C-alpha cells in the first residue's frame, strides 16, 4: 500500500490518532490530532509530556496487557467532551507489539 494512500485514510478519520513507539515517542499524528493538539505535541516528543502520572501508569499497564495478547482496550469515558478513549496496540507481521495509539470516539 502506498504511503500517500495510507496517510489519506488516516487523515479521513474523524478522531485523533497519535501513534507512539515502544519508547513512548510520538511517531505519527493524523490531521485531526494535529488540529486538536496544535503546537502542544510534536513528532519526536514523549507522550508522557502531555499525560499525568496516573495516565502514565495506565499506558504502561495497557502496553503490558498488549504484550500478553490483548487487543484494543477501553481506557476511559470523558463526560465533558462526551468521548470514549481507547488504547490500541500495533503489531508487526510476527505479532510483536511495535507501538500503540490512543483514539478518541466522540458520541
Q: What do the PLM-derived regions correspond to, one by one?
A:
Residues 32-107:
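Sensory/regulatory domains in signal-transduction proteins
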Residues 1-29:
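Sensory modules in modular signal-transduction proteins
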